[in-house]
Curated annotation (Swiss-Prot):
UniProt keyword Transferase present: no
Classification of source organism: Eukaryota, Metazoa, Spiralia, Lophotrochozoa, Mollusca
GO cellular component, one term: extracellular region
More info: The mature peptide does not contain cysteine residue.
Name by which UniProt lists this protein: Conotoxin VnMLCL-041
A molecular function (GO) term: toxin activity
Main location: secreted
Tissue-wise expression: Expressed by the venom duct.
Statement: the UniProt record of this protein carries the keyword Secreted: yes
Signal sequence annotation: 1-19
Positions of the pro-segment in this chain: 20-43
Record PTM Lysine amide, positions in chain: 64
Location of the protein in the cell: Secreted
Keywords: Amidation, Cleavage on pair of basic residues, Neurotoxin, Secreted, Signal, Toxin
């Protein structure tokens, strides 16, 4: 009779430890995929305008006082 509770406890402990096959497959695909595969392209104009905005806005605020 002691085997049944021990079996149930072991079953409960082992089930969360098993990986989700879909999740591991998606993770492995994401690891192998590069930015060019995901159509992620950084636009230089966006980067430059962001840098200029972060520099110019405090400068203009300081000049206005």
């Amino acid at each position: 009779m002691l085997c049944l509770p021990v079996f149930i406890i072991l079953l409960l402990l082992a089930s969360p430890a098993a990986p989700n096959p879909l999740q591991t497959r998606i993770q492995s695909n994401l690891i192998r995929a590069g930015p060019e595969d995901a159509n992620i392209k950084t636009d230089k104009r966006v980067i430059i305008s962001g840098l200029l905005a972060s520099i110019l806005v405090p400068l203009i605020d300081a000049i206005k006082g």
